[in-house]
């Protein structure tokens, strides 16, 4: 009797085993939150969802193509933006030590401090984005000093940087400190202002140094 059950179980396992390419195609159709839960199904599922580059890029592309998914990648320190997919926030001590939090995976990555603590006369905005050319995730910080009417820019590259990199040479106008930036085709776009007019600032190839 036991031998018969073992043969039956073996046949069922053999029947239920699907080709890898079919599993990948099925997983691509699932919502992001379902993919997060399915990482614990097996080592194979975890490898596909977390490490397979083509799979990850396909899922991200499909998600961004859905209506209503073009979300701003911006969070102001000490302020929650519920529409963002990723948020950047500092601690309650008002130090410029941000963290990137992914609401889908419930994981966060702490970043080094940017500079002195935020005071009532300074404001810091951060943008989180992906550089498809270098295959890197980066954070751009913009600290605006209301007393000095100056703004400083720093960039942090995830997985490589141990500190923030100061960006120099941006003197023709100041970025509007409350503007919401969006990522379009791999570049950030947001508003900036000059003394006499408002204009649109786009981080295109000629100004790639900002990213």
Curated annotation (Swiss-Prot):
| InterPro entries xref list | F-box-assoc_interact_dom, F-box-like_dom_sf, F-box_dom
A Pfam match is F-box
Task: List the SMART domains hit by this protein, alphabetically.
Answer: FBOX
Q: What positions does the domain F-box occupy? A: 12-59
Q: Which SUPFAM superfamilies match?
A: F-box domain
Per the record, the domain of life is Eukaryota
Q: What is this protein called?
A: Putative F-box protein At1g52490
Organism, by scientific name, is: Arabidopsis thaliana
């Amino acid at each position: 009797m036991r031998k018969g059950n073992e043969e039956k179980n073996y046949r069922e396992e053999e029947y239920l085993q699907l080709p890898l390419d079919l599993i990948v195609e099925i997983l691509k159709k699932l919502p992001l939150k379902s993919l997060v839960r399915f990482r614990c199904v097996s080592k194979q599922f975890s490898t596909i969802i977390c490490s397979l580059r083509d799979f990850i890029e396909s899922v991200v592309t499909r998600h961004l193509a859905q209506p209503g998914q073009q979300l701003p990648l911006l969070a102001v320190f000490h302020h929650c933006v519920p529409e963002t997919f990723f948020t950047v926030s500092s601690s309650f001590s008002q130090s410029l030590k941000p963290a990137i939090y992914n609401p889908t995976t419930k994981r966060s990555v702490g970043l080094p401090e940017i500079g002195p603590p935020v005071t009532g006369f300074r404001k810091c905005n951060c943008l989180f984005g992906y550089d498809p050319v270098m295959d890197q995730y980066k954070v751009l910080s913009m600290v605006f000093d209301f007393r000095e009417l100056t703004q400083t820019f720093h960039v942090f590259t995830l997985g490589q940087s141990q500190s923030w990199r100061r960006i120099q040479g941006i003197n023709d106008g100041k970025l509007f400190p409350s503007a919401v930036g969006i990522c379009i085709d791999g570049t950030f776009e947001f508003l900036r202002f000059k003394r006499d007019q408002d204009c649109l600032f786009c981080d295109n190839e000629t100004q790639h140094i900002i990213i």
